Design a protein with these regions (language model features):
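Residue-level detection of the helix-turn-helix DNA-binding "recognition helix"
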Residues: 13, 27, 38-40, 67
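Alpha-helical residues within the helix-turn-helix
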Residues: 13, 24, 53
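Phosphate-coordinating loops and pocket residues in cytosolic domains that bind phosphorylated ligands
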Residues: 64
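DNA major-groove recognition helix of helix-turn-helix/homeodomain DNA-binding modules
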Residues: 46-61
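A short, Lys/Arg-rich alpha-helix, primarily the initiator
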Residues: 1-14
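Short alpha-helical DNA-recognition segment
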Residues: 16-35
Length: 69
């Protein structure tokens, strides 16, 4: 199974921001971000869309989905 939390974390780290900063900028709780990145829980689609928009990537890119051509 794909590690979606690692993908979310990678995008955050590429911007050079902390979980707390991501929380402040997106309005998503720090606890949720921590749980997703640690693999404890998965974000629902609404949060995925919010993160993808913030990072400026597609949903496929956010979760590390590769092109299936």
């Amino acid at each position: 199974m794909k590690n979606y939390g690692a993908e979310i974390k990678s995008h955050r780290e590429n911007l050079g921001i902390s979980q707390l900063e991501l929380s402040k900028r997106t309005g998503i709780s720090h606890q949720n971000i921590n749980r997703w990145e640690s693999g404890t829980t998965l974000p629902n689609i609404a949060f995925c869309v919010k993160l993808a928009d913030f990072y400026g990537v597609s949903l496929d890119e956010l979760i590390g989905r590769e092109n299936r051509s």
